[in-house]
């Protein structure tokens, strides 16, 4: 059975792990943008890794995949924790998918929609296989691969109300460029991706605030921020910033 599952895995040389749908810009004869054309699933603008504030990168890693910089595509500790959560019916245990696996799920397997239970298990196994393949490509350093994965992930994710990717989210929620986001604003955006509808900071600010508290707690525990930065971010969040 496992041989058949592996035989049906997409070839790593033919897949594209990044998003393909982006908003289109209309320019005048002087090269100025006069309009932005957006269709369903394309309200996205590309951002490079160098344009991402470090707090945003750290916030997503802290809440989504704390061992991202260390693992090689899959995280056995997270998988075991997730299994224990399923067995004990503990929703707070979290999922077992790494950021790499989430990216593959979204851009290679179409988000895993309309799957039966068996198909879901097959897809999960194939995600893990591809994640290992992608993170262990020859000719690239571990850091280069990790930065590329994070860039594609942060350009891909659904951040509520047809807001795709962090660049559009920064404008949507804070009316600023992604590179200008503060720590507290970064945690607002990082909090959305788990459930873009229920955690939308405009329509469900109280739910987003609860998730943001967890993001900040994780960042503090993982050494990305100190206690003073944590307290300042909480204060700014409570003051209200979302447009």
Task: Identify what each model region corresponds to.
Residues 1-29, 239-243:
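N-terminal hydrophobic targeting segments that direct proteins to the cell envelope
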Residues 20-23, 27-226:
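Peptidoglycan glycan-strand catalytic modules in the bacterial/periplasmic cell-wall system
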Residues 226-243:
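Non-catalytic structural connector segments
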